Amino acid sequence: MVSLPITMVINMTGYLLQSRRTLLKQLALMSVASTFPYTAFSKFKPALITRPIPSSGQRLPVIGMGTHITFNVGNDPQARLNRTEVLRTFFDMGGQVVDSSPMYGSAEAVLGFCINRLGKSASPLFSATKVWTSDTEDGKEQIADSQRLWGLDQFSLNQVHNLVNWRSHLDTLLQMKADGHLQYVGITTSHGRRHRELEKIMQSQPIDFVQLTYHINNQDVEQRLLPLALEKGIAVIINRPFSKGGLFDEYQRYPLPDWTMEFDCSNWAQFFLKFVVSHPAVTCAIPATSRIDHMIENMGAGYGRLPDSGMRQRMI
């Protein structure tokens, strides 16, 4: 058995990690470039699409990731290792925004395990979680628990989950932000619930982010909430962009239209995601997956062109 000098092992390990990151990005770019049969790939170098957070100007990639159900795997060692590789792929392909919640079972603990194993590879991380309890003091404890589970000193974003006890929790989060213990404050809803109340909060409260449900078969938020976010300078995170997988059940039996090449789309996942993030009010979408191949498809939506308003109408 041949022993290698430790410096050579370290150099080789660093090279392999860098090669993996480069390879995954090239896979995404190749999927984009494949939609241009007459364009040489060597000349086609699309950039990762980013959008600014209106309150700060910080730019985020338009494709993030959620963890609902997919990271709720408890202490299963093999499942935890799998999720670590899913998260590694996300970062290797340029992802930053990772969203979770105490509501998601063991997801936050599993995320902490994955982030710890990845070390510097889990960077840059834009950490987003939520506070979800009807009691104000319990909410403060929950925030501290989430930081411990993730292994972080502070979060990039904390959000009041589904408007539960939103007045008190919003006070807590805004004070944390004022004290320098939190970068951004947000509020969330899902399934199209409580939109009127959410609209009033967006009108009256100094929030940085709003999170809501939006996909190609549910465009209700285009009427009032998305225009309001643009008007008020509020960043928008989109949850359930695949309608919990329902869009695949409906569309995947059909071939992807040839005209999707016009906005660099290679599969149905990218079709659904590019529709969502092409809306000018949307900052980021957070699809969830437990599979590396699906993560590669999802992240590919963050490269190349996006559909314009005319193409969006054709997609519907």
Regions found by a protein language model. Name each.
Residues 10-31:
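N-terminal secretory signal peptides and thylakoid transit peptides that target proteins
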Residues 30-34, 53, 224-316:
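Structured C-terminal cap/extension of enzyme domains
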Residues 35-67, 72-77:
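C-terminal segment of N-terminal export signals and the immediately downstream linker at the start
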Residues 53, 65, 98, 111, ...:
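Conserved, mostly hydrophobic/aromatic
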Residues 68-80, 130-136, 262:
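Active-site mouth loops of central-metabolism enzymes
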Residues 74, 133-220, 224, 230-237, ...:
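Glycine/proline-rich, positively charged
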Residues 99-114:
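Glycine-rich, proline-tolerant flexible connector loops at the mouths of alpha/beta enzymes
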Residues 112-127:
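Alpha-helix-loop-beta-strand connector modules within alpha/beta enzyme cores
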